[in-house]
Amino acid sequence: MENFDKVKDIIVDRLGVDADKVTEDASFKDDLGADSLDIAELVMELEDEFGTEIPDEEAEKINTVGDAVKYINSLEK
């Protein structure tokens, strides 16, 4: 499973949004209705799924689904 698909599954599960709404350009707040607590929980779940720690200063830069995928991909290089 690609990282995008893993991230998408986590978002759908955590936020309860329709999978069709989860695109790389989708904003967590504006398009998916996430608040700051939802985003913090998503970051923690991404950390667990990908076995990493995302520093707060990096987590603050993750505003879209694509941002999250790019960050995860950057860890694997």
Curated annotation (Swiss-Prot):
A GO BP annotation: lipid A biosynthetic process
Compartments (UniProt record): Cytoplasm
PTM per Swiss-Prot/TrEMBL: 4'-phosphopantetheine is transferred from CoA to a specific serine of apo-ACP by AcpS. This modification is essential for activity because fatty acids are bound in thioester linkage to the sulfhydryl of the prosthetic group.
Residue intervals of the Carrier domain: 1-76
Pathway field: Lipid metabolism; fatty acid biosynthesis
SUPFAM superfamilies given in the database record: ACP-like
Disulfide pattern: none
Protein name: Acyl carrier protein
